[in-house]
């Protein structure tokens, strides 16, 4: 018999830095998920990623207190800010420029994000990343 799914939980946890402190601990604890088991499994799965990169994580938890997790790649905005060497996007994106990135950097970001994007090919993924850059006030050269 299959395990009965109780619900799902979406968290954004820094890669390699999952610990029982807020916001991770309380969110998992109130749903009956073993916090230390999650932290160990998450940190092991994100060991090859850059430490501290925000990882959107979808946790499905079951009636027998077990869980599965799907760890996605960091958001496009994280990669764009890193490539442009800025802390945040522009306050007025259509009028201000927060930074600049090259088309090669956009392609690199699109290749890294390809599995999480709703695109058929790399050109479609690049268009999605270009739209994110435009909305953040990052100029593409």
Swiss-Prot record:
Q: What does this protein do?
A: Forms part of the ribosomal stalk which helps the ribosome interact with GTP-bound translation factors.
User: Which InterPro entries does the UniProt record give?
Assistant: Ribosomal_uL11, Ribosomal_uL11_bac-typ, Ribosomal_uL11_C, Ribosomal_uL11_C_sf, Ribosomal_uL11_N, Ribosomal_uL11_N_sf
Give UniProt keywords alphabetically.
Methylation, Ribonucleoprotein, Ribosomal protein, RNA-binding, rRNA-binding
Gene Ontology cellular-component terms listed: cytosolic large ribosomal subunit
Whom does it interact with, and what assembly results? Part of the ribosomal stalk of the 50S ribosomal subunit. Interacts with L10 and the large rRNA to form the base of the stalk. L10 forms an elongated spine to which L12 dimers bind in a sequential fashion forming a multimeric L10(L12)X complex.
Tell me the GO molecular function terms.
large ribosomal subunit rRNA binding; structural constituent of ribosome
Q: Which Gene3D superfamilies match?
A: Ribosomal protein L11, C-terminal domain, Ribosomal protein L11/L12, N-terminal domain
- What is the name of the protein in this document? Large ribosomal subunit protein uL11
| Free-text description of this protein's post-translational modifications in UniProt | One or more lysine residues are methylated.
One GO biological-process annotation of the entry reads: translation
- Gene that this polypeptide is encoded by: rplK
NCBIfam families named among the record's database cross-references: L11_bact (TIGR01632)
Spell out the family assignment given in the record's similarity comment: Belongs to the universal ribosomal protein uL11 family.
């Amino acid at each position: 018999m299959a395990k009965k799914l109780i619900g799902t939980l979406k968290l954004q946890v820094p890669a390699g830095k999952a610990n029982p402190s807020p916001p991770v601990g309380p969110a998992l604890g109130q749903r009956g998920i073993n916090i230390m088991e999650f932290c160990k499994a998450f940190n092991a799965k994100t060991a090859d990623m850059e430490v501290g990169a925000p990882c959107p994580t979808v946790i499905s938890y079951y009636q027998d207190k077990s869980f599965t997790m799907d760890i996605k790649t960091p958001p496009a905005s994280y990669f764009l800010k890193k490539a442009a060497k800025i802390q945040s996007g522009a306050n007025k994106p259509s009028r201000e420029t927060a930074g600049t990135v090259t088309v090669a950097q956009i392609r690199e970001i699109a290749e890294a994000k390809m599995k999480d994007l709703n695109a058929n090919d790399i050109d479609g993924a690049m268009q999605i990343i270009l739209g994110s850059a435009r909305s953040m006030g990052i100029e593409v050269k």
